[in-house]
Amino acid sequence: MKVEFDIIDNHALSFEGHHIDLHNNFDFVGYDYNKAERQIKMNWKKSSGDWVRKYEFSSLILKHSAVTFLKVIDQDQIGNGEESGCLGEISFFPSSEREVNDQLLPQSRPNEGDDIIYFFESGQCIRIHCEKIELIIYKD
């Protein structure tokens, strides 16, 4: 898997000198899956909290290309609606261990054959295997 970023502290991305805190400064809007093109776009928008820097990107997309695996584990039945868009953690994890969906590894870059797993505060988990992840950023 080729990626354009490093994962920092399992909740943020480092990209071209920018620290992008997906847990605190961005809300997950949803994902678009184009099965024919084997592409998944994970969509994020800047949080409205007063702690978010004014010069933070307005939104971003993590575009997964040549997807060969997708697993979505639904959120908890008693999830808090406010938490549904909040990323808990993000991790690369070996695709050989797909039965394990509740652990993370503190690695900044993927190893050969890794999946990427997005853990949300709501209990939802999205696991993807692809050839490339591109980070697309938008400014106001």
PLM feature segments, named:
Residues 1-140:
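Surface-exposed, interaction-prone regions used to assemble/regulate multi-protein complexes
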